[in-house]
């Protein structure tokens, strides 16, 4: 197989469809990943990534992103950046640096400003409304504020056998100021090696980091595991370890792709979705189920896809 792209969640389908056009034209995986993730970041109804992303406890949007080149193993990452558009592009630029390639907070913002990245207020009116609703529910109904942590994570393989991984997220909803999860952390939120393959994770970053899960999947693929076997084993093993040692495990979901274009996916939750497109397969959204440590999936129906769009665009109401 010449090229392929896989990403976490339904929200990535339009992005990987656009990115695949570049791969068809012989463009590089990095360009495809950046283009695809920027589309997710720019869509205001995706409330866990980029513009319109859900804010922290102080109603500030802090964004994390990362980019990794599977040929050189170069990494660029940012954490807790505010008021800059398209953090994936900032991370990609940072991957060109020999030193200082992971910047956070004001340091990341200074770097973005000096390198001409667009400054934008990333907090939308809709996100503020959602914040106020959840704040009220937290106080009045005792609901957990930490709901909403859906990272877009992506891996691409191009016609030159180069592989790239990218991530972008606004992180845990109503998180403490300065909190950073797994998404920009190499080996946890992402990892890619063009000689083997790549993986990316989404879910509760605090738990995903406890298993360095993306690196573990790539390691298993290097040992000869099929991507699906590697994904299932990594998620099942970490879920079991956390349950045994801590009494419970947070949400753990992963996607992976090897350097031959074969993909895998695994989750320990209900409702995980992913998006994939290859030279041989049209862009498809899949719905996942997990039973006894094995993940299965089937294409989303047109009815499900229509209901999804209706749900994410529905007005925010206060009881």
Task: Name each region found by the language model.
Residues 1-319:
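Alpha/propeptide regions of enzymes that mature by internal proteolysis
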